[in-house]
Amino acid sequence: MRFTVKGKTEAADISGEVEAAVSHRIPVIGLYPAMENTVVLELLDKSGKVTDSQEITITTDELPDKLDDAVKPVKTSGESAFELTMVYGQRTTFPFAYDCMGDIRWYMSGEFTSGIYMLSNNRMIVASNEAFMPSQDKPQTTNLYEMDYLGRAYTMYYVAVEITMK
């Protein structure tokens, strides 16, 4: 099964695939905020050929106020090596990702100021700032979560000792 969120340009399309199954849950990411998004669902055979397809429309809410003008492209080629560019850290309290045209296509609704670390399996390690907050005795967060772009947590790590750089 393949999904494609249609972009404002063909280069801005975001696609992904899930393994064949009797029933599917499609993890659609890359929807534009505050608009009707067209998503193409394609059923693939074993060779990758499309056997059936369907278009659906998904309407989304507006971005949080803090993200309204977060990306201001001055000049863009309209192409990128990556479908989405992730932004987090510094003064960014809502981690977000934008496409080749500078449009925000994903954001994390919780405020995460402690850090996000991208993994090679399309997941991330998120440092929690909700519990066991850093203190003078323990300057870093103690809870880390491995999660995906949909916010599904897979593993929680508890850091019991202080991490120091030498």
Regions found by a protein language model. Give the residues of each.
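Exposed beta-strand and adjacent loop surfaces of beta-rich binding modules
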Residues: M1-R2, T92
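Extracellular low-complexity, O-glycosylation-prone stalks/linkers
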Residues: R2-D13
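Short, conserved catalytic-motif segment at the N-terminal edge
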Residues: A12, E17-A20
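Histidine-/acidic-rich catalytic cores in large beta-rich domains
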Residues: A21-I29, E36-K166
